[in-house]
Amino acid sequence: MTDSRYLKRTIVKEEIESRYLGEKRTLRIYLPPGYNELLSYPVVYCQDGEEFFNFGRIATTANRIILDEGAEPFIIVGVQVDVSVRTQEYAPFGDRFKAYTACFAEEIIPYIEEKYPVRRSPQERILAGDSLGGSVSLHLALLYPDLFTRVISMSGAFYSASQEIYAAAEDLSWLSIWMIVGLQETAFAADTGTYDFVQLNRDTRDLLEKRGALVSYQEKDGNHQWGFWQNELPEALLYFLQER
């Protein structure tokens, strides 16, 4: 049974008008236990924001690791996506990719930093995503290394178009990425084809390491679904947020 302390959480909804996307985008913001506007906090930005809260149970997990497992209190920002245009926004070959990444870095980040006491160092901003959300998080770091240096990727959809972009980078020694993929993800049917996610993640790990990135990489029994990712979220968050 879940400890009742983990269920008492503060989540705020915001709406941002994006000129890049030409529409409004909903943000869901988690504030940690003991939240105080006079303090400052690390921040985790999640792609597929609604799913991270609803299926990943990230707010409950955050409470638990902050209250009982030594995580530094942190803020979470979940960025909503319309599933019907998710691939267009998250994949580098998508027709909304440039607009989405610009919105994320140039509109969402300044909006949050103006309204909430989040820290502004690249080491205090973490990008998190599953599947295509993992790959677009890595793209964001490469596009805006002055903003992002830390990435959580769960079963990243590192298609060849993404790998070619990553491979073009010469020095990634500034990047730290936590990666996991499920061993049962060898033939996952995505909207653009069927892919061996284990091989995609191994190849991406190798090319990142060759360019100097700090990579924490794991393969575990699991499928391409939230039941797997939810269980791995605590370790992913603690990797970057454990108070030392």
Regions found by a protein language model. Name each.
Residues 1-244:
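Non-catalytic cap/lid and distal C-terminal segments of serine-dependent acyl enzymes
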